[in-house]
UniProtKB/Swiss-Prot annotation:
Purpose: RuBisCO catalyzes two reactions: the carboxylation of D-ribulose 1,5-bisphosphate, the primary event in carbon dioxide fixation, as well as the oxidative fragmentation of the pentose substrate in the photorespiration process. Both reactions occur simultaneously and in competition at the same active site.
Name assigned to this protein: Ribulose bisphosphate carboxylase large chain
Cofactor(s) needed for function: Mg(2+)
Catalytic activity: 2 (2R)-3-phosphoglycerate + 2 H(+) = D-ribulose 1,5-bisphosphate + CO2 + H2O; D-ribulose 1,5-bisphosphate + O2 = 2-phosphoglycolate + (2R)-3-phosphoglycerate + 2 H(+)
Keyword field: Calvin cycle, Carbon dioxide fixation, Chloroplast, Disulfide bond, Lyase, Magnesium, Metal-binding, Methylation, Monooxygenase, Oxidoreductase, Photorespiration, Photosynthesis, Plastid
Residues recorded with modification N6-carboxylysine: K191
Enzyme class: lyase
Higher taxonomy: Eukaryota, Viridiplantae, Streptophyta, Embryophyta, Tracheophyta
Entries under PANTHER family matching the protein: RIBULOSE BISPHOSPHATE CARBOXYLASE, RIBULOSE BISPHOSPHATE CARBOXYLASE LARGE CHAIN
Self-association state and partner proteins as the record states: Heterohexadecamer of 8 large chains and 8 small chains; disulfide-linked. The disulfide link is formed within the large subunit homodimers.
Gene3D superfamilies xref list: Ribulose bisphosphate carboxylase, large subunit, C-terminal domain, RuBisCO large subunit, N-terminal domain
Taxonomic source organism: Cephalotus follicularis
Co-factor binding comment: Binds 1 Mg(2+) ion per subunit.
One cellular component (GO) term of this entry: chloroplast
Keyword Magnesium listed: yes
Length: 459
């Protein structure tokens, strides 16, 4: 009979409930909300087809290849408990559909077209299982957690950071001054805000220079290694690279990139440069909420976090947990572990749909940042553990006596919490007490505690 033209029925080949997934398959879990009257199997096959080899009609060139070898398969569909008309569709993609070492291509394939599909009211990519065979084609983070600790000579505690505010409008000299004060007071890092690139009131080269001066001055005075996340994000990859090169010439330890607005291609290039030249890479997730905030449509942040670990970054912002709902704590810790650990078991209560084996890809430090202050320190230490960066922007700069005392307050609070934990005390229960005790002998901490005391401390 040869070839039969016509619009085709997805039932034919893309829904295969008896398929046994291969170790080399990339697996995806999609949350589907089909249009009224569309059965979930139909929607599931449509997703599998459109994100792999399918098109809407039979084409004669299908006969020139083995579709069976290259097609995505929807191999399982389950209703979502407690939600009306929502299903999780599991899709397996053969490894050969993807270019090696390209997060960009992986996303183009898996989420490129299918989210506009008519048969679906909404679609969300909840998780991806990246097989070791594909993981191994990526460099991953430039250095990873252990190498970073060795470079900085800081062990056994979370690292402290601070975003310099006001984020826009300071001159380079005053900006550098604020950096110096914070580092001098006891922080490990200060940070360019994600919107600080190279604006008329402060060009990037001037900022880099004054920040480098601040770093070296603070290092000389404290005897500790200091850093400032110099934002290398730019309008072109060439310009971004130029900024990273200048940072390396200044001898500073770390640069920064906005990986979603900058794009995965730029980010991966920068990560490769950073490994080749000994720079740490701090990643900010500006724009993530556009993609991950809706519960039923978009991409969950855990997928963006996995993608970043493949593309490359040593730190990434990952929410604070503090003062949020209890459920979010487990979900956040789920993707925090996906960033840090080598091997993570499937655990649906933490939102982890697949067991993920990263083999030896370096880990990423999660960064807790946004609306946190000294009273949160026990909770943060308890939740994130040692391998994290705690960032207090307003929580440092708004200390009543200035930046340096604000930094002192945070460092004292952190050291007190770490010591209490090491002595076996329960940070969840005794957190407030630990901070109060420490503030008795640290006037800076006492002043900070006073400012934020009416803000609730909740686990």
């Amino acid at each position: 009979a040869g070839f039969k033209a016509g619009v085709k029925d997805y039932k034919l080949t893309y829904y295969t409930p008896d398929y046994k997934t291969k170790d080399t398959d990339i697996l995806a879990a999609f949350r589907m909300t089909p249009q009224p009257g569309v059965p979930p199997e139909e929607a599931g096959r449509a997703v599998a087809a459109e994100s792999s080899t399918g098109t809407w009609t039979t084409v004669w060139t299908d006969g020139l290849t083995s579709l069976d070898r290259y097609k995505g398969r929807c191999y399982h569909i389950e209703p979502v408990a407690g939600e009306e008309n929502q299903y999780i569709a599991y899709v397996a993609y053969p490894l050969d559909l993807f270019e090696e070492g390209s997060v960009t291509n992986m996303f183009t394939s898996i989420v490129g077209n299918v989210f506009g599909f008519k048969a679906l009211r909404a679609l969300r990519l909840e998780d991806l299982r990246i097989p070791p065979a594909y993981v191994k084609t990526f460099q991953g983070p430039p250095h990873g957690i252990q190498v970073e600790r060795d470079k900085l000579n800081k062990y056994g505690r979370p690292l402290l950071g601070c975003t310099i505010k006001p984020k826009l409008g300071l001159s380079a000299k005053n900006y550098g001054r604020a950096v110096y004060e914070c580092l001098r007071g006891g922080l490990d890092f200060t940070k360019d805000d994600e919107n600080v690139n190279s604006q008329p009131f402060m060009r990037w080269r001037d900022r880099f220079l004054f920040c480098a001066e601040a770093i070296y001055k603070a290092q000389a005075e404290t005897g500790e290694i200091k850093g400032h996340y110099l934002n290398a994000t730019a309008g072109t990859c060439e310009e971004m690279n130029k900024r990273a090169v200048f940072a390396r010439e200044l001898g500073v330890p770390i640069v920064m990139h906005d990986y979603l607005t900058g794009g995965f291609t730029a980010n991966t290039s920068l990560a490769h440069y950073c490994r080749d030249n000994g720079l740490l890479l701090h990643i900010h997730r500006a724009m993530h909420a556009v993609i991950d905030r809706q519960k039923n449509h978009g991409i969950h942040f855990r997928v963006l976090a996995k993608a970043l670990r493949m593309s490359g970054g040593d730190h990434i912002h990952s929410g604070t947990v503090v003062g949020k709902l209890e459920g979010e704590r487990e979900i956040t810790l789920g993707f925090v572990d996906l960033l840090r650990d080598d091997f993570i078991e499937k655990d649906r209560t933490r939102g982890i749909y697949f067991t993920q084996d990263w083999v030896s890809l370096p880990g990423v430090l999660p960064v807790a940042s946004g609306g946190i202050h000294v009273w949160h320190m026990p909770a943060l230490t308890e939740i994130f553990g040692d391998d994290s960066v705690l960032q207090f922007g307003g929580g440092t700069l708004x200390x009543p006596w200035g930046n340096a005392p604000g930094a002192v307050a945070n460092r004292v609070a952190l050291e007190a919490c770490v010591q209490a934990r090491n002595e076996g005390r329960d940070l969840a229960r005794e957190g407030n007490e630990i901070i109060r005790e420490a503030s008795k002998w640290s006037p800076e901490l006492a002043a900070a505690c006073e400012v934020w005391k009416e803000i609730k401390f909740e686990f």
